[in-house]
Amino acid sequence: MTTRRNFIKNTAKVAAALSLPVVTANTFGFNILHKDLKPEDTIIGHGDFKFKVDKGWAKMSANTNPILNCHEMVQDSKGRLIMIGDHTHNNIIVFDKSGKILEYWGHSLPGGHGLSISQEGGEDFLVMTDCGYFQDKNGDWKAQTGQVLKTTVDGRLLFSIAHPKTIGVYKPDMKFQPTETAVAPNGDIYVADGYGSDYIIRYDSNGKYIHHFGGHDSSNAAHNLHNAHGIAIDARDKNNPVLICTSREENCFKYFTMEGKFIRKVDMPGMYVCRPVVNGTNIYAGVCWSKDSAGKMFGNSGFVTILDQSNKVVSNPGGTPPEYKGGVLQQVYQAPEKTFYHGHDVCIDEDKSVYVCQWNAAFTAPVKLTRV
């Protein structure tokens, strides 16, 4: 994937070169942005979706619980907030809503990236992806084949899903670097191969292959995916659940039936959107990068975006206000006063607070946005 690969190349030895002092979350990289603005004074967002920024929410030490990239977060049935990252000291960190760490585990996912949660028989289960990117012994970022794992909520492995070439779905030379999963109500697992070959691969609840779609080879370009970074099940219409897939290089979401038939595209101009997160009647997403006025993508330009029931953008916390002309969304930019580096995922709790995970963000912990 071009964007991530370029940024990895440019920052290849940062983590190896930097020593991490013992600090609390209040100085966990958050001092770099907003040096002259107190976190409690910062309100971001638009319309009915405005938030107070709490950059010191996570009560943690970089020495005890180091973070490279804070990738994704979900909330379990007990209200706990579960984060996945790619530091093998603690791939999984579990917080309570006050930001206190309850537990941490996981040492085998150097590319820990995607995290989904499902319930079966009243029990929570996690589905994780290792996207294949890892740091070698010299601190250089490299790529290898990724994997998907289904575990209990405390980390007991149930099964893993390997390279699709092992079952004849991919050709031997095709890459498999999965970035995300979505779990259907019946337990079927949809895997987004966002850093690999851009297919959406469907398995049953036991990891048996069903079918796949997407990729780059459809004669109808609208059906193709380019950096299929995220996927979610949109059940806002309970009688007609559909899949929302990220085509991040195209700055859009694409809708498909649960069987993989293309429905429509929702353009997100200037926004390199990550996984869509459906909450109530809204869709939230992290924006990893945005573009400048010349249409060029640049680093440290992320924010969060929120869409309504009609897939109209209603707020861009950390970005510029949404503007529509003739029913068409105009390009959205990062706000002049930076709040985020690279918005990679969001988790929304029952109070409608938003927890923002960031990639390549100076080792920062999740940032809490409290609805105001």
Regions found by a protein language model. Give the residues of each.
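Blade/loop signatures of beta-propeller domains
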Residues: 32-54
